[in-house]
Amino acid sequence: MNQKIFILFTLLVFFSACRSLHSVTNIGANDSFVLGNNRHGYFNVKLKNLSAHSIKVYQKTLTDSVHSFSVIKPKETVHVYADKNTALIIENKSEKQASVKLDVRGDVNLSMGYK
């Protein structure tokens, strides 16, 4: 019986871990980080600005339609919900490097890169 409980617990942890992504991402001066610029399902992000300056966050569809602009202040945390096939763009217009903490849930089959 204990072995069955252990196996069940291990499977639950494994499948839960596969649906989430945790990262601290550094974005260079005057650069952008793009999350999900590919075909994918819905996802949501808990994003914390770890920098000493504000960053801009917005979403862009695969057809280049842009929406949901937000300015995230230093140490501020926001929740962003992204539709299917929509990228999240984190833009650093500062002359200094920016850092963000990302907790992503949902479809995590997302492309990641710098623009």
Indicate where each model-derived feature is located.
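Structural beta-strand segments of beta-rich domains
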Residues: 41-45
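Asparagine-centered strand-capping/turn motif at beta-strand->loop junctions
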Residues: 47-51, 90-94, 102-104
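Positively charged n-region of N-terminal signal peptides that target proteins for export
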Residues: 1-5
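C-terminal partner/receptor-binding element of secreted or periplasmic proteins
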Residues: 94-115
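Short, surface-exposed beta-strand/strand-loop-strand elements in extracellular ectodomains
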Residues: 52-68
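C-terminal motif of bacterial Sec signal peptides marking the signal peptidase cleavage site
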Residues: 15-17
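Tight coil/turn sites that cap or link beta-strands
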Residues: 24-32, 36-40, 74-75, 83-85
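Bacterial signal peptide processing site
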Residues: 19-21
